[in-house]
C-alpha cells in the first residue's frame, strides 16, 4: 500500500440516520483548531501574523514532471520484473494506482509519450551508473577518469536522441513562424528527407493534445499535391537564453558561450540544428551569493548538468562535445547556484537546488545567472521538396527583365502557370474536403517536385499556433529575428479577416489563391513593384496589362480577392470554372462532382442508419 487511512472518532448520528456514508480520506489529517489570539498592537505591520490560515498554492499541470514520474514507474517495473510482458502489466497497474490517487494523469501514461519515456529511462539508468561510479571513486580524481566520463556522455547523447541517432543533418532548408526545416539523410536507408522541428513553448495537457491531434490529422492526408508525411515523434530539449561566457573549472575543460562557439570553426553545432540539451551561459563576474534556485530534483538522484564543452589538450587542438542533462525540472525555471556545485551533488527531495558543500576536486564553479527553459520538440519527417514556388517565380521574374515588350510576354508561359495553379487548387480542394484550413498559403509553402514539377502543398500552419514557439527560438542574442520583409510577405497573402483577427474559414485560403494566381501571370521587375501590386489587390486594383493579356485570370483574381467572403468561389467552383475548361479538365470536373456526390451519399447513409436505430429502440 502506498498510502493508508484510519478513521478515528464517532460518526455523526444524524448522518447515520440519513444513510450518508462519506468516503474515507486518502490521508487523515488532524482537525484544525482556531489559533490563539495574541495582542499584536505593538507589532510592526510587516511582522504581523496572518489572520487567515495559509492557503496551499496551486500548481499548474506540468507534463515534464508527470512524465518523469511515469518514467520512474516504468523503470522500476523493468528492474523488479525481468519478464517484458509482466513488466508492462506491472507498469500499467502502477499507473492506474497513481491515477486513482490523483498523482498522475492518464494522459502522460499514453503511448504517444513512449519515446520520451524511453529517453528518460536511459537517462535514469545512466545516472544510477554514474552515481555508483562516483561513489566508488577516490576523492582525488585524475584526468583519465574525467575523460572516461565525457566519452560515455558523448555515446549516451547519440542513444537518447532519435534525431541524432537515425539522421545525418545536411542543410537547413528554411525557417518560419512554426519552426525550421532541415534536409537530412537517413543512416539506414540512405534516402534524403525533410524534417521539421517545432519547438513547443508550453506543455500542458491541453496543449500537447492539440499538437498531437493535428499531427494525426496531417498524417491522414494522402494526395499527389500534398507533401508526403512519413512519421513524427517528440523529444525533450532545453532552450537557453544565452548571455556571456561561462567559466567552469574542470580539468582540461573550458566552456564557451553560444556566441563564441559559433565563431569557433571547431565549435558545437547551432542549437537549432541539434536535439541535444544545452546548459545555460553565465556571466563572468566575481563569485557572489545568489538567490535560491527554483529547480527541483524530482527523483532525488544525481543531476548531471550539461554544457557545450571545448576540450583543449596539450597541443591546443580543439574538439567539440556535448553533454546531456539528465535531470528534468519544470517547463520554465531559472536556476541560480550558490557557491560551488560538486559533480556528485544530490539535491534534497523538497529542497531548492543549492550547494553549500565545498569540494577541492571536480567542482563546477558556476558564475552569473541564466535562464533555462524546458520544452518539447516535435519532429515531423516529410518528403523532401527543395524547389519552392517562390524560387520558380523569382527565377521567372529574373528572365522577364530581359524583355521590354510586355505585350508579347514570352516569359509568362500560360500553360505552365495554368498547370501549376490547377494542381494547387486540386490540393486545396482535397484539404478543404477533409475539413482542414491551411491558413498560410503562399509561394514559400508550395513546392515543385520532380522533373515534371508537380505541385506539393506543405508547411501547414498549426491551429494551435499560440503554444508554438515562434522563429526567435534559435536567436542567439535574445532579440527578435523577424524582419520587416518577412512580415510583409505574410501579410500580402493573408485574407483581410485574418489580418483583422476575426473568424475565418476555407474562404481565407481562397483569398491567398487569388494573390498567387496574380503572381503566376504577372511578372515583377522589383520587390517594390511586387509589394505595391499585391497590396493594391486588397482594394480591387489589378494591373491593366494583366487584364488585357489574361482577362479570364483577371476576372477570377477579382472574385477571389474580394472583401465579401461569401462571394469568393470555392476550390470546387474554381476547378469547374472556365479557368481550366479543356478536354482533360472536363473529365477532372466530372471526377470532382462524383467525389462530392459520393460524400453526400455517405452522409445520407449515416442519417438513415441513425433513423433506423431510433425506430428500433422505439419498438
Curated annotation (Swiss-Prot):
The answer to whether the entry has keyword Kinase is yes
For the modification Phosphothreonine, which residues carry it? Answer: 283, 483, 485, 490
What's a Gene Ontology MF term here?
eukaryotic translation initiation factor 2alpha kinase activity
Q: Relate the outcome reported for changing residue 490 to D.
A: Almost complete loss of kinase activity; even upon arsenite treatment
* Reactions performed catalytically: L-seryl-[protein] + ATP = O-phospho-L-seryl-[protein] + ADP + H(+); L-threonyl-[protein] + ATP = O-phospho-L-threonyl-[protein] + ADP + H(+)
The free-text function statement in the UniProt record for this protein reads: Metabolic-stress sensing protein kinase that phosphorylates the alpha subunit of eukaryotic translation initiation factor 2 (EIF2S1/eIF-2-alpha) in response to various stress conditions. Key activator of the integrated stress response (ISR) required for adaptation to various stress, such as heme deficiency, oxidative stress, osmotic shock, mitochondrial dysfunction and heat shock.
Protein name in UniProt: Eukaryotic translation initiation factor 2-alpha kinase 1
Q: Name one GO cellular component term.
A: cytosol
In residue numbers, the region (Disordered) covers 1-40
- Its gene name is Eif2ak1
Q: How is loss of this gene reflected in the phenotype of the organism?
A: Mice are viable and fertile without gross morphological abnormalities but display hyperchromic anemia in animals suffering from iron deficiency. Dramatically altered response to diet-induced iron deficiency shifting from an adaptive decrease in red blood cells (RBCs) volume and intracellular hemoglobin content to an increased production of abnormally dense red blood cells (RBCs) with decreasing red cell counts. The decrease in RBC number is the result of increased apoptosis of erythroid precursors. Diminished levels of phosphorylated EIF2S1 in bone marrow-derived macrophages (BMDMs).
Amino acid at each position: 500500500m502506498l498510502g493508508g487511512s484510519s478513521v478515528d472518532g464517532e460518526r455523526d448520528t444524524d448522518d447515520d440516520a440519513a444513510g450518508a456514508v462519506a468516503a474515507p480520506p486518502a490521508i487523515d489529517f488532524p482537525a484544525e483548531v482556531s489559533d490563539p489570539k495574541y495582542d499584536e498592537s505593538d507589532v510592526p505591520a510587516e511582522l504581523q501574523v496572518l489572520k487567515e490560515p495559509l492557503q496551499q498554492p496551486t500548481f499548474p499541470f506540468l507534463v515534464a514532471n508527470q512524465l518523469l514520474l511515469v518514467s520512474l514507474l516504468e523503470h522500476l517495473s523493468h528492474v523488479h520484473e525481468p519478464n517484458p510482458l509482466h513488466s508492462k502489466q506491472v507498469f500499467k497497474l502502477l499507473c492506474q494506482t497513481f491515477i486513482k490517487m490523483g498523482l498522475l494523469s492518464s494522459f502522460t501514461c499514453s503511448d504517444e509519450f513512449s519515446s520520451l519515456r524511453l529517453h528518460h529511462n536511459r537517462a535514469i539508468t545512466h545516472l544510477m551508473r554514474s552515481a555508483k561510479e562516483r561513489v566508488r571513486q577516490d576523492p582525488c580524481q585524475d584526468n583519465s577518469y574525467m575523460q572516461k566520463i565525457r566519452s560515455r556522455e558523448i555515446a549516451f547523447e547519440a542513444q537518447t536522441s532519435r534525431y541524432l541517432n537515425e539522421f545525418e543533418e545536411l542543410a537547413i532548408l528554411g525557417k518560419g513562424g512554426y519552426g525550421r526545416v532541415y534536409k537530412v539523410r537517413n543512416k539506414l536507408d540512405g534516402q534524403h528527407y525533410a524534417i521539421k522541428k517545432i519547438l513547443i513553448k508550453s506543455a500542458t495537457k491541453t496543449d500537447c493534445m492539440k499538437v498531437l491531434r493535428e499531427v494525426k490529422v496531417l498524417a491522414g492526408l494522402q494526395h499527389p499535391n500534398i507533401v508526403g508525411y512519413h512519421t513524427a515523434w517528440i523529444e525533450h530539449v532545453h532552450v537557453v537564453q544565452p548571455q556571456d561566457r561561462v567559466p567552469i573549472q574542470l580539468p582540461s575543460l573550458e566552456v564557451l558561450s553560444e556566441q563564441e562557439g559559433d565563431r569557433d570553426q571547431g565549435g558545437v553545432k547551432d542549437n537549432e540544428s541539434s536535439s541535444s540539451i544545452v546548459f545555460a551561459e553565465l556571466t563572468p563576474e566575481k563569485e557572489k551569493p545568489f538567490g535560491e534556485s527554483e529547480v527541483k530534483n524530482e527523483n532525488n538522484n544525481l543531476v548531471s548538468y550539461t554544457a557545450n564543452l571545448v576540450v583543449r589538450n596539450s597541443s591546443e587542438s580543439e574538439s567539440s562535445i556535448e553533454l546531456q542533462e539528465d535531470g528534468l525540472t519544470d517547463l520554465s525555471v531559472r536556476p541560480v547556484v550558490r557557491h560551488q556545485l560538486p559533480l556528485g551533488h544530490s539535491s534534497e527531495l523538497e529542497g531548492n537546488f543549492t550547494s553549500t558543500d565545498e569540494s577541492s576536486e571536480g567542482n563546477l564553479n558556476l558564475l552569473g545567472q541564466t535562464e533555462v527553459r524546458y520544452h518539447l520538440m516535435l519532429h515531423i519527417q516529410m518528403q523532401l521538396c527543395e524547389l519552392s514556388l517562390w524560387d520558380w517565380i523569382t527565377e521567372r521574374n529574373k528572365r522577364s527583365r530581359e524583355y521590354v515588350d510586355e505585350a508579347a510576354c514570352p516569359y509568362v508561359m500560360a500553360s505552365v502557370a495554368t498547370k501549376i495553379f490547377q494542381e494547387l487548387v486540386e490540393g486545396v480542394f482535397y484539404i478543404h474536403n477533409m475539413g482542414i484550413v491551411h491558413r498560410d498559403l503562399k509561394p514559400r509553402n508550395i513546392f515543385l517536385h520532380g522533373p515534371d514539377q508537380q505541385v506539393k502543398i506543405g508547411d501547414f500552419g498549426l491551429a494551435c499556433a499560440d503554444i508554438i514557439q515562434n522563429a526567435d527560438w534559435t536567436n542567439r542574442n535574445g532579440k527578435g529575428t523577424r524582419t520587416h520583409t518577412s512580415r510583409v510577405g505574410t501579410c500580402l497573402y493573408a485574407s483581410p479577416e485574418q489580418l483583422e483577427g476575426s473568424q475565418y474559414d476555407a474562404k481565407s485560403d481562397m483569398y491567398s489563391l487569388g494573390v498567387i494566381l496574380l503572381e503566376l501571370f504577372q511578372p515583377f521587375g522589383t520587390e517594390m513593384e511586387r509589394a505595391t501590386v499585391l497590396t493594391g489587390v486588397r482594394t480591387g486594383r489589378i494591373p491593366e496589362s494583366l487584364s488585357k493579356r489574361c482577362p479570364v485570370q483577371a476576372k477570377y483574381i477579382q472574385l477571389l480577392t474580394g472583401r465579401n467572403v461569401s462571394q469568393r468561389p470555392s476550390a470546387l467552383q474554381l476547378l469547374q470554372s472556365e479557368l481550366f475548361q479543356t478536354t482533360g479538365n472536363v473529365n477532372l470536373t466530372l471526377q470532382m462532382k462524383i467525389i462530392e456526390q459520393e460524400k453526400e451519399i455517405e452522409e445520407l447513409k449515416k442519417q438513415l442508419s441513425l433513423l433506423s436505430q431510433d425506430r428500433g429502440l422505439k419498438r
